[in-house]
Amino acid sequence: MSQKRNLPSWMSSRDPEITPSKSHCKKPKDEGPTEEHNSRNAPSNKSEHAEPSSNTTEFSKLMEGVVFVLSGFVNPERSTLRSQALTMGATYQPDWNAGSTLLICAFPNTPKFRQVETNGGTIISKEWITECYAQKKLVDIEQYLMHAGKPWRKSSSPQDANREKREHLSKKPEKQVEKKTETRGTPSTSSKNRSACNLVKEPFFVTEVKKWARDDLSQTISWLESQEEKPEPGEIKRIAAEGVLTCLQDAIDSLEQKQDIGSVTELWSFVPRVVKELGKMESSSKKENSTASKEEVCKQAKSWKKIYEAELAKPGEDESTSRVACGYDSDMTVEMTEEEIELAYRNVSLECL
């Protein structure tokens, strides 16, 4: 259950050119020493001995095929991001065009963001570049997606790229290939499985999930305020956020125990949208007789929970602006009588003399 949700290889961070068949080739036992020596030098087996390259060479090729554009950044941050991506083998372009594959964007919903979104391009946050550079490997790109579009790197083979896009999420891709060959004669069944599985594999945009979090918090606060027994005004936001996350965690626990999410929603008077969306994914996979399992829905739920935790931890606009403008916490205000004020004034005057 702790494994990360697998993505099609064009959306994952693994090198698409390296396959299990190339990295686990074995020699027949009956081959002699001479045949082994000749096979090492044969052109057909070069890929076996090409992998163990130096760390420097591998690092400089991590982002080969990535053609990126930067938007919303100023120096020195802009030059740092550009330098890091170039060091890992990516290609820089000053503006988006037909040859671009990836937009690294500082803010959502900017003119450049909408342009690339309309063109079907993939958009990520800067943290993916910095994490790849720091860890010296391609980290999972999913949590950094701001918009999932076309492949974020150019594939060496167009046929491979098309095939990779069609692959379903699965823990064991080998079994999935076998299943495709078995169901080749029944297109209606396979098409149902594909459409339902897409509900799980096609990620909601991160910006959309963040909006869910803000809306869920606002609606939970409104619900709490409408109750006869309501929390203190200074505690209501914290309690609302804890309630949303607790409900989401209950849904995750239910999925881990192979139970329906409906068993959770029945117990809560107010159900956040994120839990409702998970319930829709679960029920759709059942109706379509999909191969999508509770484990896949659970992985999606855990991914969304991380986004919710980060979004709900942010201070609200009213909270942050009031503290900056006023310079004090209103909860710390002390009421004083006229005599206390007069006494305090005299004490301050004496200290100043």
Swiss-Prot record:
One molecular function GO term is: double-stranded methylated DNA binding
Please list the coiled coil stretches.
240-260
Cellular location(s): Nucleus
Task: Give the species.
Answer: Arabidopsis thaliana
Loss of this gene results in the following: Reduced capacity to complete DNA demethylation initiated by ROS1.
UniProt superkingdom: Eukaryota
What keywords sit in the KW lines?
Coiled coil, DNA damage, DNA repair, DNA-binding, Nucleus, Repeat
Biased segments, Basic and acidic residues type:
28-39, 161-183
List the GO biological process terms.
base-excision repair; double-strand break repair via nonhomologous end joining; single strand break repair
Indicate the segments forming the BRCT domain, all copies. Answer: 58-146, 266-347
Role, per record: Corrects defective DNA strand-break repair and sister chromatid exchange following treatment with ionizing radiation and alkylating agents. Involved in DNA demethylation pathway by stimulating cytosine methylation (5-meC) excision, gap tailoring, and DNA ligation.
> What Gene3D superfamilies would the database entry show?
BRCT domain (3.40.50.10190)
Q: What is this protein called?
A: DNA-repair protein XRCC1
User: Quaternary structure?
Assistant: Homodimer. Interacts with polynucleotide kinase (PNK), DNA polymerase-beta (POLB) and DNA ligase III (LIG3). Interacts with ZDP and ROS1. Binds to various forms of double-stranded DNA (e.g. methylated, unmethylated, with single-nucleotide gap flanked by 3'-phosphate or 5'-phosphate ends).
Main localization category: nucleus
InterPro entries reported for this sequence: BRCT_dom, BRCT_dom_sf, BRCT_XRCC1_rpt1
Q: Where is this region: Disordered?
A: 1-57, 150-194
Would you name any one GO CC term?
nucleus
Q: Where is the composition biased (Polar residues)?
A: 1-12, 184-194
